[in-house]
Amino acid sequence: MGSHMVWFLFLVSFFSVFPAPSESMVRHYKFNVVMKNVTRLCSSKPTVTVNGRYPGPTIYAREDDTLLIKVVNHVKYNVSIHWHGVRQVRTGWADGPAYITQCPIQPGQVYTYNYTLTGQRGTLWWHAHILWLRATVYGALVILPKRGVPYPFPKPDNEKVIVLGEWWKSDTENIINEALKSGLAPNVSDSHMINGHPGPVRNCPSQGYKLSVENGKTYLLRLVNAALNEELFFKVAGHIFTVVEVDAVYVKPFKTDTVLIAPGQTTNVLLTASKSAGKYLVTASPFMDAPIAVDNVTATATVHYSGTLSSSPTILTLPPPQNATSIANNFTNSLRSLNSKKYPALVPTTIDHHLFFTVGLGLNACPTCKAGNGSRVVASINNVTFIMPKTALLPAHYFNTSGVFTTDFPKNPPHVFNYSGGSVTNMATETGTRLYKLPYNATVQLVLQDTGVIAPENHPVHLHGFNFFEVGRGLGNFNSTKDPKNFNLVDPVERNTIGVPSGGWVVIRFRADNPGVWFMHCHLEVHTTWGLKMAFLVENGKGPNQSILPPPKDLPKC
């Protein structure tokens, strides 16, 4: 046998035992959904958790890895888990929103979510996608680059996951159920949370989260806003962040002392521990520039330099004012895609479907809603308040089950009016389970226009199954003649969750290259509950990898 053949056989045997560093892996996780007594704000309550942890466990993987996550439901509620921001290319069965892509996992039942992290790296997250269970059922999903592939920014010395949330002393299911009976808005949360801790609050001297750092080292903070209903500002006293990624997409780095992060969004920032030894206050506080009630309790934590005595005083900072629109706009307007050769911004430049969706609130008749004087607050897209079906939409589409949904969702508002101002006499909405159909690979431009019906408000809108580019935003009513002239088609930020500004509009573009049924909804949970949601039905293409895969055998049944 020649020396070349011996060497070849050695290499074959070597790589069969030691896989190449770039080879993707199959990673197995098990989520036991269980009740656990959790104490916060000096009171305890039975809480739905994953593996008895609040917040839930962080999932770690690498780009192109396959995840098999077995979810076992040990609680009295139906359960489903959404992997927020994961593209789920051809695997809509694993996306997770109950009654959209799957029937929920019933008590005592099991479902294994099986999907591949195709071409994605960065910080995403997971959460329950049924009822209000995501108040406590959530955690981070960290997707590292492939081995040997560096970050497109200076390598940090360490990484930390920071998940922001909200906490109610009362049972959240009772809170939303009572609100639905009354027709009014639910009670706001009792506190915000930083990695599951509020920090010391009035009448309850609890410990907050401590972020330990060493002088001179740089840390990558992976921020997630898992709050149900509130946009948040995030600050560290005396420190400046460098923003490097949002929604698992790299951005052109920029510096800021305040991060704005809406429910559903993720943001990666670099923090260099360049100050004198000490303890520095961390704040998570609400942003709301509309006359809407919010939880105004600021959650706090500390950045704790090594060698600092625990008795040392904490260096303080004031959070931004609740209505600090200019700070919010400065942050949002600084976001640009990296748009490098390795990470290009593939913005659609020709458009097949021009859509215009109004997003906002309304009032429908409710004779039993005594507190609401016979009316119920609802929410809608293009004046359609979405009604959840009794069975899941994706299986109904796949198996051609009739009578579950229609595909006549309006591409424009049924009534043209002064969306961002002026009074509206009829605030009623239509209801229905209506989808918008898109051919495979169609390009879409979608205008999301806030309305002032009842009150203007910032709506963080999340699209499942796709990333999209924000090509423009502004205040007032979108002008289809003037505003496109200012679109950014070169390096617009790429996201999966976008904030529609209060009293304004945002325009997104995406390519419908992922067949299936894909939910789009406001990520303020109260607005989703009220009906601010719809779904796109993306048809199969004609190529070999352009059709949705068959459903798994253990897909839950309704």
Swiss-Prot record:
SUPFAM superfamilies: Cupredoxins. Transmembrane segments: none annotated. The keyword Transmembrane helix does not apply. It comes from the Eukaryota. GO terms for molecular function: copper ion binding; hydroquinone:oxygen oxidoreductase activity; oxidoreductase activity. PROSITE patterns: MULTICOPPER_OXIDASE1, MULTICOPPER_OXIDASE2. Keywords: Apoplast, Copper, Glycoprotein, Lignin degradation, Metal-binding, Oxidoreductase, Repeat, Secreted, Signal. Cu cation 3 binds at H129, H464, H521. Ubiquitous, with higher levels in the inflorescence stem. Binds 4 Cu cations per monomer. GO terms for cellular component: apoplast; plant-type cell wall. It catalyses: 4 hydroquinone + O2 = 4 benzosemiquinone + 2 H2O. Its cofactor is Cu cation. It is found in: Secreted, Extracellular space, Apoplast. The keyword Secreted applies. Cu cation 4 binds at H459, C522, H527. Residues 32-148, 158-308, 408-542 form the Plastocyanin-like domain. NCBIfam families: laccase. Belongs to the multicopper oxidase family. Lignin degradation and detoxification of lignin-derived products. Required for secondary xylem cell wall lignification. This is Laccase-4. The lineage of its organism: Eukaryota, Viridiplantae, Streptophyta, Embryophyta, Tracheophyta. The gene is IRX12.
